[in-house]
Amino acid sequence: RDSSLTSPHIHLSLGTTATLGDLADRMGNGGMVGIGFHVKQRTGLYWGVQANWGFGHRLREQGVLANLLTPAGDLIDNEGQVAFVSITGRTGLFTADVGWLWDGLGPNPNSGILLKAGAGSFHHRLHFENTEKRITQLEQPQLQYYDRLTWGVAGRLTLGYFHMSNDGLRNFFADLSLTRATTWPQ
């Protein structure tokens, strides 16, 4: 199409995340999935909401389960056997976004460079995966003392490319985002 359109859209996203600052002391890089609803106005204004969930962040923090280990460094399950526990980080980011689309790069005025800013909430915690026997200390209500749940406010800046094809069948976006959050233990 050769004219600028108002276009509401639901989108799914998939990507990777890199941790920095204090969060990098606790967990490493991981994956990310998300869903959002945004509206691109004729004028270039772009606004909406987005939810992202991070998973698979490698644990970096030492001594998370230190008080549950035997003198030999083993974790014992409810049956008295050595337990094998995988610990990863999980995150959640929920934002309301506003931005601007500069057209001129793409097949029509609905494609171009997209700059947006968002504000919302961010949380992160540790996830314990035990595929063997139960470990009572890593179940509710005790789990809350080990999962290191923190929650707080976040801001996000995103720069990317938004593409809307002429036939409406190949719409996509690619971007880089920088998120800054301040969180508190829960």
Stretches found by the model and what they are:
Residues R1-P8, T43-G44, G104-G112, M164-F172:
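Short loop/turn motifs that connect adjacent beta-strands in outer-membrane beta-barrel proteins
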Residues R1-Y46, Q50:
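Short glycine/proline- and aromatic-enriched beta-strand/turn motifs that initiate or cap beta-hairpins
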Residues T6, M27-V33, T88-F94, S111, ...:
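Residues that define the transmembrane beta-barrel architecture of outer-membrane proteins
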